[in-house]
């Protein structure tokens, strides 16, 4: 009887430890692929402001919009509109989705060298942005 209780306690402890590992696993932000437009965003371009605002919108809202979110940010004074889409794997948590997209937003300009349009895939998330609707 005592052995059975010890086995049950061991199994319960093992199950709890396994659950903790699963729950604390961070988003996988390893680079997978990219496709970058050859045109670059001109320094000081009004499009750059629209693009950064649109990327912030993607980062903040994708996890709460079914893990697939499209948006655009119009510019004032004739500045080009920035169009974007972000997705996350359905199997990750909302906080991991947001963390993955935050990581990608911080890296996307260096990955694509300030391209006017880009598609970048990390293991757990994806962002596409363009100067035209898609």
UniProtKB/Swiss-Prot annotation:
Entry's localization field: Secreted
GO annotation, cellular component aspect: extracellular space
Keyword Secreted in record: yes
Chain segments annotated as transmembrane: none
Gene Ontology molecular function: actin binding; aspartic-type endopeptidase inhibitor activity; D-mannose binding
Signal peptide (UniProt feature, chain positions): 1-26
Domain Gnk2-homologous: 29-134
InterPro entries named in the record: Cell2Cell_Antifungal, GNK2, GNK2_sf
Disulphide bonds in the chain: 36-112, 88-97, 100-125
Keyword Secreted tagged: yes
GO BP term (any one): defense response to fungus
Alphabetical keyword list: Actin-binding, Antibiotic, Antimicrobial, Apoptosis, Disulfide bond, Fungicide, Lectin, Mannose-binding, Plant defense, Secreted, Signal
Binding site for alpha-D-mannopyranose: 37, 119, 130
Family annotation (PANTHER family): ANTIFUNGAL PROTEIN GINKBILOBIN-2-LIKE (PTHR32080), GNK2-HOMOLOGOUS DOMAIN-CONTAINING PROTEIN (PTHR32080:SF54)
Quaternary structure annotation from Swiss-Prot or TrEMBL: Binds actin in vitro.
Function: Possesses antifungal activity against F.oxysporum, T.reesei and C.albicans. Weakly inhibits the aspartic acid protease pepsin activity. Exerts antifungal activity against S.cerevisiae and F.culmorum through its carbohydrate-binding specificity. Acts as a lectin that stricly recognizes alpha-1,2-linked mannose moieties and interacts with the yeast cell wall mannan polysaccharide. Can interfere with the fungal actin remodeling resulting to the activation of an actin-dependent cell death.
Protein name: Antifungal protein ginkbilobin-2
Higher taxonomy: Eukaryota, Viridiplantae, Streptophyta, Embryophyta, Tracheophyta
């Amino acid at each position: 009887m005592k052995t059975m209780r010890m086995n049950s306690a061991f199994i319960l402890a093992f199950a709890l430890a396994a659950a903790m590992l699963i729950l604390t696993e961070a988003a996988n932000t390893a680079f997978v692929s990219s496709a970058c437009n050859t045109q670059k965003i001109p320094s000081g371009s009004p499009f750059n402001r629209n693009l950064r605002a649109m990327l912030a919108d993607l980062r903040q809202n994708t996890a709460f919009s079914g893990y697939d979110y499209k948006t655009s940010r119009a510019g004032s004074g004739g500045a080009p509109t920035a169009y974007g889409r972000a997705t996350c794997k359905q199997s990750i948590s909302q906080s991991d989705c947001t963390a993955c997209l935050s990581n990608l937003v911080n890296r996307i300009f260096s990955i694509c060298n300030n391209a006017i349009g880009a598609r970048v895939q990390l293991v757990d998330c994806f962002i596409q942005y363009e100067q035209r609707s898609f």
